[in-house]
């Protein structure tokens, strides 16, 4: 039995180095604080770490309806009919490659990020990008219709860290 346990410990270290990208916070009207300017805003925060050897981030699904922590009644949200308003990208202590790409797509493959987060991720400073296909006075924002898939690509730094804040607004 000791040999089996020892073999498992020796042969599985690569599994510990797998990249992660998880919902780490949801700010909605149920836990309103200084992050939420009004009742029609939901902020979903993803904390992502690249693989320790392959420097890749896993794609992550943001459910259309959910809560944080998952399965609780806390911080409940329903993004149906909301628009993706802004995306904040903050590099962590282990900085990613400059000009990394973030994509946000729905179940039908529509790019809710409108290509605005392509090859322009900063490795050193936080960025807040408005997601609109036109300018004032008539900006057009992509509407959330299904669960979202978030992917980070074009990174070549092992264990790079990125925090994403997806800001959704209710359509008025």
Where are these regions (language model features)?
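Surface-exposed, low-hydrophobicity beta-strand/loop segments enriched in small/polar/acidic residues
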Residues: 18-172
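N-terminal soluble segments of membrane proteins
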Residues: 2-3, 17
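Sec-dependent N-terminal signal peptides
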Residues: 4-13
